[in-house]
UniProtKB/Swiss-Prot annotation:
The keyword Phosphoprotein applies. CDD domains: RUN_RUNDC3B (cd17700). Belongs to the RUNDC3 family. Pfam families: RUN. It comes from the Eukaryota. Residues 1-25, 213-238, 337-359 are annotated as: Disordered. Residues 301-326 form a coiled coil. This is RUN domain-containing protein 3B. InterPro entries: Run_dom (IPR004012), Run_dom_sf (IPR037213), RUN_RUNDC3B (IPR047339), RUNDC3A_B (IPR047340). It comes from Mus musculus. Residues 58-190 form the RUN domain. Keywords: Coiled coil, Methylation, Phosphoprotein. PANTHER family: RUN DOMAIN-CONTAINING 3 PROTEIN RUNDC3 (PTHR46251), RUN DOMAIN-CONTAINING PROTEIN 3B (PTHR46251:SF1).
């Protein structure tokens, strides 16, 4: 019984150690895989930039095909499958992630790729997106925007994916250099075929380095230890040849010279354009100074005119107040004079009343002249003397001078 228990205990310990070893091995493999993909992506970007100095990059360029394969492998690294109704996971393309995570990019091409007629599968749409983003020079912006949406990235990828690790920031940075390249792609070519996955060609980036402890050269070691059949698969034969013929060097020199001439012409054109723009800028600056001076002068004139108008308004207000005070003073003076001289007003009123009374008396006695007759006759005068005691008759002199008592 004791031996059985010890055996079971040792077996359980051995099983636990084996499980820990498997986890560490899988973690190492995942780290190596991530490091390999990021390194190959850096190499592919560098070779793509170097090739763009000599020719236009299109679908036939092997450097671009290798870069597209590397980027597709990176975006598909540890991508979760799509769960069906029956609980099974179906394979998913990285386009499903890009379509959701890159919606926030301004003026994105997501809808255009979704509406393409000759592209049906998700893998083909993802490859078309890579080409369109490179032609638009926005691939780095798409990747950066997608990586910032950590919630969506976490939903589409498993733990240990490149887009969830520290390598993601390196990926967005190295893709930024591709914005300086002019790409030309045909979105109806064979490169968009989504039937087969992309395969990375590692041979352009492999280089055999001789150890410092080795005595013989690499060629002697390969001839000694390798056969004729195996020599064809050595890195020497697979990679670029070490010695190039004279024609190849001449062609490369010719291309470099043509590139130099083109660059020199572009440099002269840009310098001439720069001088023209500098002249235009100096003219604009001088015109701007003149306009600013005019604006300052007009502002100063407006301020002076405003001050003058305000001064005139103040003067007019003072004059108006003085006139109002004079009118009020004249009214007070007239009232005071009327209150100080009441006899004059009473005499005027009495004269007016007497005149009115005389007129009324004359109108009340219209037959008086007929009874008295003419004032020139003696009889009339005698008859008038007898009536002197009456107050209503005036004196003969008054009657003679009065216009109303003229003889008929």
């Amino acid at each position: 019984m004791a031996s059985r228990s010890l055996g079971g205990l040792s077996g359980s310990r051995g099983g636990g150690g084996g499980g820990g070893g498997k986890k560490s091995l899988s973690a190492r493999n995942a780290a190596v895989e991530r490091r390999n993909l990021i390194t190959v992506c850096r190499f592919s970007v560098k070779t793509l930039i170097d090739r763009s100095c000599f020719e236009t990059i299109d679908d036939s360029s092997p450097e671009f095909n290798n870069f597209a394969a590397v980027l597709e492998q990176i975006l598909s690294h540890r991508l979760k499958g799509q769960v069906t109704w029956f609980g099974y996971e179906s394979p998913r393309s990285f386009w499903d992630y890009i379509r959701v995570a890159c919606r926030k990019v301004s003026q994105n091409c997501i809808c255009s790729i979704e509406n393409m007629e000759n592209v049906s599968s998700s893998r083909a749409k993802g490859r078309a997106w890579i080409r369109v983003a490179l032609m638009e020079k926005h691939l780095s912006e798409y990747i950066s925007t997608a990586l910032r949406d950590f919630k969506t990235t976490r939903r589409f990828y498993e733990d240990g994916a490149i887009v969830l690790g520290e390598e993601a920031n390196m990926l967005a940075g190295m893709l930024l250099g591709l914005n300086a390249i002019d790409f030309s792609f045909c979105l109806k070519g064979e490169g968009l075929d989504g039937t087969f996955p992309a395969v990375i060609d590692y041979t352009p980036y492999l280089k055999f380095e001789q150890s410092s402890d080795s005595i013989s050269s690499d060629e002697e070691e390969l001839r000694t230890f390798g056969s004729s059949d195996s020599e064809s698969s050595t890195p020497e034969n697979v990679g670029p040849p070490l010695i190039l013929d004279e024609n190849t060097w001449f062609n490369k020199c010719k291309r470099v010279r043509q590139k130099y001439q083109l660059t020199l012409e572009q440099k002269g054109y840009l310098e001439e354009l720069l001088r023209l723009r500098e002249n235009q800028l100096s003219e604009s600056v001088s015109q701007n100074k003149i306009l600013l001076q005019r604006i300052e002068d007009s502002d100063l004139a407006h301020k002076l005119e405003k001050e003058q108008l305000e001064y005139i308004i103040v003067e007019l207000q003072d004059q108006l107040k003085s006139y109002q005070s004079l009118d009020q003073l004249s009214a007070e003076v007239s009232l005071s004079q009327a209150s100080l001289d009441p006899s004059h007003s009473q005499e005027g009123d009495g004269k007016q009343d007497s005149l009115n009374f005389i007129g009324e008396g004359k109108e009340d006695t219209p037959s008086l002249l007929g009874l008295c007759g003419s004032l020139t006759s003696v009889a009339s005068y005698k008859s008038l003397t007898s009536l002197k005691s009456n107050d209503c008759l005036a004196s003969p002199t008054t009657e003679l001078t009065s216009p109303g008592l003229t003889p008929s």
